[in-house]
């Protein structure tokens, strides 16, 4: 059997304390554990950072990075730092207010293996409102 590729999941976070726990919970519930999570906090002023620190301390595949002096540098610089810190063959992005189905990493890895010449993969999304009801499904 072919070795599963390592995927680096980059989560850029800025003042998402309300959602980041659910996002990280969805990542640690993945059926395939062959991936790393790179969370870059962009100078949050809410309680995001302590929540992320707790996860990074509890789970060895979650790494936390911040900009020097915990500055706010914007999304582009935050994503760039995440890419620089990643170790994966492949990069996936998870927004800090999103959550993934439990088999999403497995789906990505299977798709990569089935399409070795692909430069990128795009998958469908489901938009869930604040009442946890689907609003859009692609």
Identify the meaning behind each predicted range.
Residues 1-138:
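Nucleotide-sugar donor-binding/catalytic module of glycosyltransferases
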């Amino acid at each position: 059997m072919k070795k599963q590729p390592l995927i680096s999941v980059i989560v850029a976070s800025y003042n998402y304390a309300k959602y980041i726990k659910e996002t990280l919970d969805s990542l640690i519930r993945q059926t395939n554990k062959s991936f790393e999570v790179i969370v870059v906090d962009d100078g949050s002023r809410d309680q995001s950072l302590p929540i992320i620190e707790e996860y990074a301390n509890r789970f060895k595949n979650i790494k936390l990075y911040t900009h020097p002096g915990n500055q706010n540098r914007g999304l582009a610089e935050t994503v760039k730092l995440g890419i620089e810190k990643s170790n994966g063959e492949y990069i996936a992005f998870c927004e800090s207010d999103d959550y993934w189905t439990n088999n999403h990493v497995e789906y990505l890895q299977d798709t990569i293996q089935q399409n070795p010449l692909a430069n990128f993969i795009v998958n469908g999304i489901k938009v869930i409102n604040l009442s946890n009801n689907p609003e859009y499904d692609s």
